A protein has these predicted regions:
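Helix-loop-helix
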Residues: 35-40, 138-153, 229-298, 303-304
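Transmembrane helix-loop-helix hairpins at lipid-water interfaces of multipass membrane proteins
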Residues: 8-63, 139-169, 259-263, 390
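Juxtamembrane loop-to-helix connectors within ABC transporter transmembrane domains
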Residues: 91-135, 191-202
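C-terminal portion of ABC ATPase nucleotide-binding domains
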Residues: 504, 512, 521, 526-567
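An intracellular "coupling" helix at the cytosolic face of ABC transporter transmembrane type-1 domains
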Residues: 109-119, 171-178, 188-191, 200-247, ...
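ABC transporter TMD-NBD coupling linker
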Residues: 262-338, 379-381, 430-438, 514
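Conserved "ABC signature" C-loop
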Residues: 410-459, 481-483, 554-557
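Cytoplasmic coupling helices
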Residues: 69-88, 150-191, 261, 285-305
Length: 567
């Protein structure tokens, strides 16, 4: 989003500030000189100069108002641009990188930047520095160059001290980003709809409040010491500037008074002195803020420079055939960045075109992790995964248009039904016939509500049951004509009847396509072509249901144990 008009207005109003200021100063000098050397014939001249001075004051007011308008507009734009750039970058990062706590901390650090503040601080330092230099030059031109050098030296020392202090304070603030994330997480537990019942039933509130207080106090103590030191430094600098200001006025008064120069010159130099001691603390403060913003900009750039995952934005498959997909996995190992051990070890699987397979095993055995690798969401630590349609290999960055999936934690979009379904293929967003057809296939059309009906209670929409949300997720998958269908244990939270319905729908969804179902409910595995039993990240058994039941192995024991629960 660009706004050239407001940007131009912003730069013009900032750059016009110093010329208007100096025009006011010198016009005031000439008015005072004319009054001092009053001449009855100078009425018109005085009137013109006073009118000019009033015009300058009026222009200064107009300039300030126009600047405020441009800053307000640019602030709104900069907030959008910052959020957009961070979200756009996030959408291009790999899932593994997104789940890394270090990446989450980097993202939070990047969000602390204010683009308009950074721009305004750069402009402020530039304008105030130019103003300061010109004021010192004018002071020097009237013979007060030693005083000008003293003031300049004090300013340089102040800028150096404030730079050091700003770096230390910002370093503390940056280091506290991860603990601030923890506080926000604890707050979310206290207000989130899903966590509130358990938090209240088990009386966890006081414990969570205590943890928040401990983190807050720790952060506060770290920052408090630096703030006291910073404010002590500011107080010392302010005292020095007050004394220097008084000395400057005294020198000007004695020097000009003893030399018999005009009152206008004294007024000019007095105003310059006042401007100097107004500009110096302002410049120091703006420079201090700029140092902090530059450090935050480095954090922002650090996040934007993270390595991106290459994905194709072309929704049309690069392979023009309707063949079912073949998946070939060889000697695959995978380890999460935060884990000390491999989550998957030496996985070797070939899923043939049109084959239905089931990944079964206890929770945490590695089933869902392998699915994420098959989806191309994680890169393998070692080994390889290849995808084929016919004789052609499907490249990893083209997988999005070849696979349709219903996740265990599928997205419950608290938005209109249209948006919930169209997530499967945004090209069909305005195609009501395709959306309705997908709903019918998923048996989600019984809601009896229009496509633009808002669902989800968060914004006052219709609340749906788990089974109804499930149907919307399946309708979303129907909208995508993929050659590989994956059902990643999305029925875990459903009642038995809804679970059976969902499984039947999945079997229809994967007709004539390669299909993978991930489940720990083994009755579902009776209807697939091949079963892979996972345990501690390894495949320990493989075969059809009948083959595995003939072997007195782990699958048979698990199946019989689950079956006994229903007898």
């Amino acid at each position: 989003m660009k706004d050239k008009r407001n940007s131009l207005l912003y730069f013009m109003t900032n750059l016009l500030g110093p010329p208007i200021l100096f025009a006011e100063l010198f016009t005031t000098k000439y008015v005072v000189d004319l009054i001092q050397n009053f001449n009855p014939n100078a009425y018109l001249h005085i009137l013109l100069l006073v009118s000019l001075l009033m015009l300058m004051l009026y222009l200064a007011g107009i300039n300030g108002s126009l600047r405020a308008i441009s800053v307000t507009n640019l602030t709104a734009i900069s907030i959008y641009e910052l959020e957009h750039s961070i979200l756009n970058k996030t959408s291009k990062l790999s899932t593994a990188l997104l789940e890394d706590p270090a990446t989450k901390t980097k993202r939070e650090k990047a969000k602390r930047l204010s683009l308009i503040d950074l721009l305004d601080q750069w402009m402020g330092v530039t304008v105030h520095l130019v103003t300061l230099v010109v004021l010192i030059v004018v002071l020097s031109c009237y013979g007060f160059y030693i005083l000008a050098l003293i003031i300049l030296g004090v300013q340089i020392l102040q800028l150096y001290l404030m730079r050091r202090m700003s770096q230390k304070v910002e370093a503390i603030s940056a280091n506290q980003t991860s603990t601030v994330r923890t506080i926000n997480y604890l707050i979310d537990l206290l207000v989130n709809r899903n966590s509130i019942p358990e938090v209240r039933m088990y009386r966890m509130s006081s414990y969570l409040f205590t943890k928040m207080r401990e983190i807050f106090i720790s952060n506060f103590k770290q920052m408090h010491r630096k703030v006291i030191y910073s404010e002590s430094l500011n107080f010392s600098q302010s005292l020095i500037m007050i004394l220097l200001n008084g000395i400057t006025i005294a020198i000007l008064a004695m020097t000009i008074g003893s030399s018999g120069q005009s009152a206008g010159l004294f007024v000019l130099l007095l105003q310059i002195s006042n401007q100097l001691f107004a500009v110096i603390p302002t410049l120091t403060r703006v420079y201090s803020d700029l140092v902090k913003s530059r450090l935050r900009y480095e954090d922002y750039r650090s996040y934007l420079d993270l390595e991106e995952q290459v994905l194709s934005d072309n929704l049309e498959s690069t392979i023009k055939n309707i063949d079912a997909m073949q998946v070939q996995i060889k000697h695959l190992f995978f380890r999460y960045a935060t884990n000390a051990k491999d989550t998957l070890r030496n996985i070797n699987i070939t899923i043939h075109p049109g084959e239905r397979v089931a990944f079964v095993g206890e929770n945490g055995s590695g089933k869902s992790t392998l699915v994420k690798l098959i989806l191309g969401l994680y890169p393998s630590t070692a080994g390889s995964i290849q995808w084929f349609k016919g004789e052609n290999e499907v490249l990893a960055h083209n997988l999005r248009q070849e696979i349709r999936v219903v996740f265990q934690d599928f997205t419950k979009l608290h938005r209109p039904i249209r948006e919930n379904i169209a997530l499967g293929n945004m090209d069909a967003f305005h195609d009501d016939s395709r959306l309705v057809a997908a709903m019918k296939k998923a048996e989600a059309d019984y809601f009896g509500v229009a496509l633009d009906t808002l669902v989800g209670p968060q914004f006052g929409g219709t609340d749906l049951s788990g089974g109804q949300w499930q149907r919307l997720a399946i309708a979303r998958a129907y909208l995508n004509n993929g050659s590989l269908t994956i059902f990643d244990e999305p029925t875990a939270a459903l009642d038995p009847y809804a679970e059976q319905q969902a499984f039947d729908t999945f079997m229809k969804l994967g007709e004539q396509q390669t299909s993978i179902i991930v489940t720990h409910r083994l009755y579902m595995s009776k209807f697939v072509d091949k079963i892979f039993l996972f345990e501690h990240g390894e495949i320990v058994e493989c075969g059809t249901h009948e083959e595995l039941m003939k072997v007195d192995g782990k699958y048979k024991k698990m199946f019989n144990r689950q079956s006994s629960l229903y007898v």
